Each structure stands twice: as C-alpha cells, then as structure tokens.
Design a protein with these regions (language model features):
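Bacterial N-terminal signal peptides that target proteins for export
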Residues: 1-8
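Hydrophobic helical h-region of N-terminal Sec-dependent signal peptides
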Residues: 10-14
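Bacterial Sec-dependent N-terminal signal peptides
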Residues: 15-42, 191, 224, 239
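Proline-centered turn/helix-capping motifs that create local helix->coil transitions or kinks
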Residues: 21, 25-26, 62-63, 80, ...
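Conserved, well-structured interaction surfaces
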Residues: 42-62, 66, 83-157, 176-211
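Short coil/turn linking the two alpha-helices of tandem helical-hairpin repeats
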Residues: 154-155, 161, 229-238
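Aromatic-lined, polymer-binding surfaces characteristic
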Residues: 210-220
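A solvent-exposed, charged loop/short amphipathic helix patch at secondary-structure junctions
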Residues: 238-254
C-alpha cells in the first residue's frame, strides 16, 4: 500500500509545484492593469494629468523667458549670463561656438504637444466625471495649445507640416507617416482659425490656481501676432518679390 501512496503523493506535489510556477510566471495580470486611452479619458484625474502633460511641452526650450540653462533668449543681450563653461554657456554663444543641436529639442516637444492635444480633443467627450463646461474648457485649452505649438514652430523653423488631427498610427510605414511641409500661409490660416475656435470656449479670466492656463485674451493675442507676422514680407515673402528666399521653395515651388 505504501508503495502505491508514495508515487501518488509525489505526483500531486509536483503537479501543485508546476501549477504554482505557471501562475507565478504568468504575465496576463500585468496586461489587465495596463492603461488605455479609454480608461484615461473616463477618469477625471487622468484626464487632468493628460492636459497637464500638454502644458508640460511648453517648458524648457519652448519658454520665452526661463532659467538660464534652457532658453537661448537669455543670451540675446548682456542682461543675464551664466557660467562660462558647461552644457549651454554664455561664452559659447558669445563666440559663436554652438550648432543647431543645442535647441532642436523644441521641434520634438512641439509635435509631442500637438499629438497630446489632438488625442485629448478626440477622446475627452467620453468622460462622465467632468461637467459639460469642464469638457468644453479642456478641449479649448488643448486646441489653444495645439495651435500655439504650431506658432512656436513657425517662428523658429518657418513653414512646417500640419499633421492630421486624428491620431497617427505608429504601425504604418515611413511613407504613410511622412507629411509634406505646408506653406507659410496655410500654417498661419490654421493657427488663426483654431485660435478663434479656442477663444469661443475659453474664459476671459481664471482663478489664482489656474492663472497660467489659456484664456480668451491669450488665444486672440496669439492669433493677432501670427497675422501681423504674416503681413510682413520679411517673414512671409510674396511671389511678387521672387528675389527673397527664392532658394527656400518646395518641389511645387511654394515658399
């Protein structure tokens, strides 16, 4: 009898051990906890964090005035200067010892912010924890930020591609994700129209806790400045003046 019991017990113990190992090595539970856009935008807290990430893309090299390290604007005159050596030093700008890689993070951050804002605009309506007024305000803020990122890009790089407002799939090939550069007028027209839409839903003032968020006045001010720059032949050369920037045309002959 003992001879029969021992193999049975051994098999049971091994079976339990294999089962427990199988449960331990299973990764299915991690995928169940993984965030999705639907989970994020059904939560008020996560939606607010997503909007905060959009604002976060305005930091560092996208700020007009900031601490010495990040903004090259601080080197425009002698009012402020920092250490004479280091990652971004006063002497490097003073003696022209810099290249285009020093501030190219701005391009990446702007398109990151554009993508974040577009995703919020497309998905925030499913949130049942936010009021209709809050949803309208969040969408307007995201719309303002998306347009403002294009304004920053236009000022620094001239005409840039206007990417589709729907989310671009990262599974596509290079051709499907490659978009041609739009003309100067097309980019400004987009900024102008989007800022008008944003201004319609943005408040004129915000409380002290939200004082740094977009307002109606901010949207209209950016629109006015973009249109002012567009009217200048220095920033936006016209066909009637072909001598200026004639080498900076695309394959269709557009400046």
């Amino acid at each position: 009898m003992k001879k029969h019991i021992l193999p049975i017990v051994t098999i049971l113990v091994l079976g339990l051990g294999i089962s427990s190992c199988s449960d331990y090595l299973s990764v299915e539970r991690f995928f169940k906890d993984r965030q999705s856009e639907e989970k994020i935008f059904k939560s008020k807290v996560f939606t607010e964090q997503w909007l905060a990430k959009c604002y976060n893309c305005l930091l560092e090299t996208n700020l007009e005035i900031t601490r010495i390290f990040y903004s090259t604007t601080n080197f425009a005159d002698d009012m402020i200067f920092n250490e004479t050596s280091g990652a971004i030093s006063y002497n490097a700008f003073k003696f022209g010892q810099y290249d285009n890689t020093w501030t190219n993070n701005s391009y990446i951050r702007c398109y990151e912010g554009i993508r974040q804002a577009s995703i919020l605009i497309s998905n925030v309506d499913i949130n049942e924890e936010l009021t209709e007024e809050e949803i309208a305000d969040y969408k307007a803020q995201a719309r303002f930020l998306r347009s403002y990122f294009y304004w920053l890009l236009l000022r620094k790089y001239g005409p840039v591609p206007l990417v589709p407002e729907e989310t671009i799939s990262i599974d596509g090939d290079y051709t499907s994700m490659s978009y041609p550069r739009n003309s100067y007028d097309e980019v400004v027209d987009y900024i102008s129209k989007e800022m008008v839409l944003a201004a319609q839903a943005l408040p004129e003032k915000r409380d002290r806790q939200n004082i740094n968020r977009a307002t109606k006045g901010a949207a209209l001010a950016v629109r006015a400045k973009a249109l002012l720059y567009t009217a200048s032949p220095i920033n936006n050369p016209r066909p009637e003046d072909p001598d200026k920037f004639s080498d900076f045309t695309d394959h269709q002959g557009r400046i």
